[in-house]
Every structure is written in C-alpha cells, then in structure tokens.
Amino acid sequence: MFKISRKNYSDLYGITTGDSVRLGDTNLWVKVEKDLTTYGEESVFGGGKTLREGMGMNSTMKLDDKLGNAEVMDLVITNALIVDYTGIYKADIGIKNGKIAAIGKSGNPHLTDNVDMIVGISTEISAGEGKIYTAGGLDTHVHWLEPEIVPVALDGGITTVIAGGTGMNDGTKATTVSPGKFWVKSALQAADGLSINAGFLAKGQGMEDPIFEQIAAGACGLKIHEDWGATGNAIDLALTVADKTDVAVAIHTDTLNEAGFVEHTIAAMKGRTIHAYHTEGAGGGHAPDILETVKYAHILPASTNPTIPYTVNTIAEHLDMLMVCHHLNPKVPEDVAFADSRIRSQTIAAEDLLHDMGAISIMSSDTLAMGRIGEVATRTWQMAHKMKAQFGSLKGDSEFSDNNRVKRYISKYTINPAIAHGVDSYIGSLEVGKLADIVAWEPKFFGAKPYYVVKMGVIARCVAGDPNASIPTCEPVIMRDQFGTYGRLLTNTSVSFVSKIGLENGIKEEYKLEKELLPVKNCRSVNKKSMKWNSATPNLEVDPQTFDAAVDFNDLENWLEQSASELAKKLKKTSSGKYILDAEPLTEAPLAQRYFLF
C-alpha cells in the first residue's frame, strides 16, 4: 500500500481527519472530525489530475441521469473543509439548480465506489483544497438606508439580511422598520435589484388591523422600537398578530423605562417568542438591566457588533454614535443623559462572557445605526479569540481543537438567526436541500476577508486581479463583482423572504417582482432551546446601582475546561453570593490591523 506524509497529503488534497488549521491570526484552531472523501480516489481538477474524461469525470451520463442516489452536478467544490454548526469535516460539495444537492464523495461511479455526486460533462469544478467553507451569514438587524451596504455585506460573508427601512429618512436612521404597504413594497422592489437575500420588518406599534395589513403586504416580521413606543400594549398586540400570521417579532425595548421596567416588558410578552435586539443595552433597551432577558426561554437574545468584543476603545466610541442614531441633541441635557444611561462598561464586559457561555444566541450588526455590516463575522471571531485568551478552552476542547467554541460562534451568525426568523429550512447551514449560499475562506484570511461568495451556486463576489491582465491573479487583487451580480443571474441567485399570507395574496405579481419569494415559517414555535450551541439560560441579575451582571455558581458549570470552582475563585462575588461576570477589555485584536488599513 502506498503511503504519503500528512504534510504532502495536505499540500495535494487539503487537510484530513485529525489535522488542525488555525483560523486567521486568532488563537483558534479547528480539527477535522471526519473526511467523507476516499483516500486514493480524491477528486482534483487540472492537468494530469483525476477529473478528466474516462477517469474521475463521467462522459456518458446526461445532466438528469442518476445512478442510485447520485446524479450529475452543476458545480462540485472538491475537498472542502466545512465549518458549520453540524460539524467540522472534509467533503466534496455538490450543487445543482441553486441548491446543495450532495455532500460527500464526488467522481465517476463507473470507476469509483460510494460516489455521492457525479462529475459529468455538465459539471464545473471549484477547487476547495486548502480552503474553509461556511454557510452564507445572516444579519438580522439591518437599517435599510442605502444600497451600497450589499457589496459590503457580501465581502464580510453575509448573504442574507433581515432589514427594515425606507432609505435615508430619519425614522430609518433610528429604527429598522418598513411601515405600511407602500414601504414594504418599496423595500421588496429595491431588493429585487440587489444580489442578496432579504426580508423586511414592518412597524409593530398599533392596533391589530393596521399591523395585519403590513404583514399581508409581505412583511416577514414586525419590529417594536422604543423610538415609536415600546409599550406593553404594543408588545402584546404585535405578538398577537404575529401568532396569527406566523411571523417573527423583534424588539428594541424602553431605555427610559417610561412605560414600565424590564419585568413589565417580560410580562407583556406572556411567554411568547420574541427576538431581543442588542440584549446588552448599549444599542438600546431598559437601562440598566435589559441584559437579564438572557434567562428567559421564550426570548431569543442577540448582540449588535459595536460592543463586540469589549475593547479599550468601546466606551469612548459609543456616545457620539448614540447621539446621531437616535436623533438626539447634544445641547439638551436630557438627551445627553439618555445616551449616557445606555453605555455601561460592566454589562458590556459581561456580554462577551454570556456569548461564550452560549447564553446570547445571535450576532448582528445594527448597520449604519451604530454597527457595521461588514464586520459581523470578524467581530464574532475576535470575541471568540478574546474569550479563549482570557478564560481558556471551552468544555471538551483541547490543544489545536477549539471545535466546540467554533461551532458555538459560527452558529451565532448562520443557523440561529435563520431559525429566529423562520428561514432555516432554506439557508443558515451547509446541509443538503438548502440554497447554495456558500462562503470560501483561505485559512489565513478566515473571519476577515472571504476568497469568494457563492449565491445559489454562482459566484457573486470573488478575489480577482486586474481585468486587463494575462492571468486572473495580477495586482491589484481585490474583491470584485462577478457574473452572479449581473442581469437575470442576479434575480435568479437571490430570494426575498415574505409572509405566507403576503405570498398567497399575490404580491409577487402585484409588485412585479422577479426574484423568487419564499415564505417564512415556524417562527412562533421556536424558543431558546431551538438555538444551536447557544441555548443557555443563566439566572442573571444586574445590580441597578453598580451595573454588575452576576450569575449563580451552577451557571458556571459545564462551560469551560477549567472547573467551575477554579473559575469562581477568579470572579468577584456579590453580597447575595452570585458571581460577577467581568473581563478586561481587549488591547489588541486579531483580524484587525494586520488585515485592514482603516
């Protein structure tokens, strides 16, 4: 039997079971859990390689032919290292008709056993050796202010947005709301010309009939925002309509505690599922204790990325952002006090730890209204690095294997936001049957700059060189638009998410939309337990005087490799015996100045 060293094998075919690779310049490593390709039968494209006629490529089968369960693919990504909530493993990925059709072994079934997907004359190849593949990310907190957010999102690995807004109007600068049929229609019509999946949230304040009218117009969910009034009555009515129409509800709660405190908001929910934006509170919400919502099973807590991770610059940055985003006047003392009440270093420090415990389930941006859409993935991995550096390995992880922590963090901007908004049957993970929205990364650039972004099987953005060069790798090598963003391909490789009732009402024809419309579903049946790798509900309390966030000893167990007793010795205790979640701000971040000039 022929033998080959692991080094030579990885150079030829990419790493395999038991090998590890570092993610960017972070301290995180992933270890390959399994390899679904076949040693000695690897699919490789190129001169002298295996995917040629009569070898790994079958030249007799037509596009619709099958052999067993295997069929001819439109595109095969060979020897991909998949990083997903489902696992960290190596496989070929087969794409057909815009969807992931197979994950496993590609090749020619006339010559090779156990082929899951066929490379035929109709098949294109993308060489995945040495690259990491993740599902396209979701950003569920997007202010629909300007179309240029789309290429920025794609360049950060985000292929889907749950947004709200009307363009550069003041209401949209503050709130993610497309109010009423005209603006829902306008948002969907604009999205029809943009290379990204999108769904839009309507205004959640009002009586049942006008709220229902917006969902019937195609809104995929509702947004309750304090700038429009986050009262108990608004919460109750929005959730009542949502339950009848199976759409999600997102909430930005009452910072000023005018209509009640956090416990009154919780009571108004009546145990019904709701997606809580920026749970820490710097982005808005009951001051100072909105963070306590992480302990409830019906609340799906999220963060926005300006506070992630907690660094030496975080506090100073926030005051000016707040004044602009919420139409506040720095000359009015009450407006300044409003802004000051939202910036608390204690709860910001605790936010990172709660993410690491799996108590905050979702990451998002709050783009152009404090957050940055192109940094959702980057800041998620910076936070994971910070937590490992300050607290050590997650339970079950080991040297050169941070797989559990990586699965926890990748879930925060892929599968969990998809579940929260009823689109997880279409997107959010690399699983057979889902849309082929896939992001490729060179390991050294992981989390910072993708190599390419595939939308429904077609490359939309890719690292590419000078268009007038003799080869595609000549400088300047930058992310550029590809054919997936042009012509009918644009509308054929993205979708819009709408309410089921809107779709049944014929809005596609009424609005003259070209993109496929997909209905959101199962929004009302999910809860915190539905969140992959992020379903913890610690008994958190925030001290109203000191703003310290503290949990019980039991909440520290089964989190880290170090024991809860060892960790407890390092944490300060409250007078009631709880343990304060605290960490030093980061002074130097990975995936930062080594990769970006600005």
Swiss-Prot record:
Its main location: cytoplasm. It comes from the Bacteria. Ni(2+) 2 binds at K223, H252, H278. Substrate binds at H225. It holds the Pfam family Urease_alpha. Pathway: Nitrogen metabolism; urea degradation; CO(2) and NH(3) from urea (urease route): step 1/1. It catalyses: urea + 2 H2O + H(+) = hydrogencarbonate + 2 NH4(+). Its EC number is 3.5.1.5. This is Urease subunit alpha. It comes from Ureaplasma parvum serovar 3 (strain ATCC 700970).
